[in-house]
Regions:
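Enriched for short, Lys/Arg-rich terminal
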Residues: 2-4, 10-27, 44, 58-67, ...
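Alpha-helix boundary/capping residues
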Residues: 18, 33-36
């Protein structure tokens, strides 16, 4: 079970940018966050563990171009990205 949900500064910037850009995508992001809090590393959005410099992080598809990148650490969800492709962490 997930306790707290937090965003890195970049993750929050991505999230807030969807508020003014695309409410439909924002709704999908919220649905993914809800599913992550319930199911962790399984569920909708094709969960995938990331490798190399993103080892320990997972991604889920928001749409064909965008991904939500996150990790669960000590029962807390940290969202590092809600946008296009993977940035170096």
């Amino acid at each position: 079970m997930i306790g707290n949900i937090s965003f890195t500064p970049d993750g929050w910037e991505d999230y807030v940018s969807w508020l003014g850009e695309d409410k439909r995508t924002l709704k999908k992001i919220l649905k993914l966050i809800e599913d992550i809090t319930r199911n962790g590393y399984t569920g909708i959005g094709h969960p995938e563990p990331l490798k190399d410099n993103l080892s320990g992080y997972w991604s889920r598809e928001i749409d064909d171009k965008n991904r939500i990148v996150f990790r669960v650490d000590e029962g807390n969800l940290e969202i590092t990205q809600c946008g296009s492709h993977y940035r170096d962490k």
